[in-house]
Amino acid sequence: MERTNCSAASTVVETAVGTMLTLECVLGLMGNAVALWTFFYRLKVWKPYAVYLFNLVVADLLLATSLPFFAAFYLKGKTWKLGHMPCQVLLFLLAFSRGVGVAFLTTVALDRYLRVVHPRLRVNLLSLRAAWGISSLIWLLMVVLTPQNLLTCRTTQNSTECPSFYPTGGAKAIATCQEVLFFLQVLLPFGLISFCNSGLIRTLQKRLRESDKQPRIRRARVLVAIVLLLFGLCFLPSVLTRVLVHIFQEFKSCSVQQAIVRASDIAGSLTCLHSTLSPAIYCFSNPAFTHSYRKVLKSLRGRRKAAESPSDNLRDSYS
């Protein structure tokens, strides 16, 4: 989207986006750090799906580490003072880690689908070494598919602008290519995940008709709902705003362009939300993760009570 001279500044939107990115960073780092600890110290049996989940954790942590810089960018009124190269590197890291996370979410869904719906396929006999090999290929593939030309910034009189979440101007062929890649990286995984999960639910309903096995079906349904909610909440708004960008890109009205930029900022910040929601998927994948998160929550509650107890005793002594 071509940027014009009309100002698109909105303190409310910039503060909201900056605050949201800060929360996503904190929650994403905490949730995925606990998951990483669980992988190293609590998970006793590693299977291919665990390898894919581990790579998802790494991708989410990588995404969370880039968010503080963009949060500061928005909280400072879209003023970027770190220079051209850091802008390029961080934008690449943001797009790359986000794409890797989506790829491993899709891989986990496909792995569960094949193991439950088609258990006799030879692909289900993959070794851990093969799973690590597939994971390495996914990382390399996403390096190639991450649009390099997105990572551009433009110098202004007072600061350097680092466009974060909306398409930038450039050659038409290059811009079209990066948009096609974006839609493929979102819509193709969403369609594949929806297909795999619907087939998984149908198969479980046929096989687990006994009343004592219904909790497994309910558990699977909840997991499917979480994954679909994750995609719908995180990526659907961004897809819609990208469509609006192409519909209204010929409009010269400043108000229209301002609205598109603000909508793109909000929708773009939502695409990073999946790193904070992924721990819910870990909990449904293995009880070890549920135990770790409960242990952390109990520890935090215990510290809060310990911090509140001195004031309570002081108040009681003077009553």
Curated annotation (Swiss-Prot):
One Pfam entry name: 7tm_1
InterPro entries assigned: GPCR_Rhodpsn, GPCR_Rhodpsn_7TM, HCARs
Alphabetically ordered keywords of this record: Cell membrane, G-protein coupled receptor, Glycoprotein, Membrane, Receptor, Transducer, Transmembrane, Transmembrane helix
Domain of life the protein comes from: Eukaryota
Side Cytoplasmic, residues: 38-52, 111-131, 202-219, 285-319
Transmembrane segments: 17-37, 53-73, 92-110, 132-152, 181-201, 220-240, 266-284
Bilayer topology term: Multi-pass membrane protein
Glycosylation sites: N5
Outcome of gene disruption: Deficient mice exhibit a reduced response to enteric bacteria, showing defective dendrite protrusions of CX3CR1(+) cells in the small intestine. Under ischemia/reperfusion injury, liver dysfunction, cell death and inflammatory induction are consistently and significantly inhibited at 6 hours after reperfusion in GPR31-deficient mice.
Residue ranges that the UniProt entry lists as topological domain Extracellular: 1-16, 74-91, 153-180, 241-265
Gene Ontology process terms (BP): G protein-coupled receptor signaling pathway; negative regulation of inflammatory response; positive regulation of immune response; response to acidic pH; response to ischemia; response to molecule of bacterial origin
GO cellular component: plasma membrane
Family (UniProt): Belongs to the G-protein coupled receptor 1 family.
Subunit organization: Interacts with KRAS; in a farnesylation-dependent manner.
Function: High-affinity receptor for 12-(S)-hydroxy-5,8,10,14-eicosatetraenoic acid (12-S-HETE), with much lower affinities for other HETE isomers. 12-S-HETE is a eicosanoid, a 12-lipoxygenase (ALOX12) metabolite of arachidonic acid, involved in many physiologic and pathologic processes, such as cell growth, adhesion, inflammation and cancer promotion. 12-S-HETE-binding leads to activation of ERK1/2 (MAPK3/MAPK1), MEK, and NF-kappa-B pathways and leads to cell growth.
Protein name: 12-(S)-hydroxy-5,8,10,14-eicosatetraenoic acid receptor
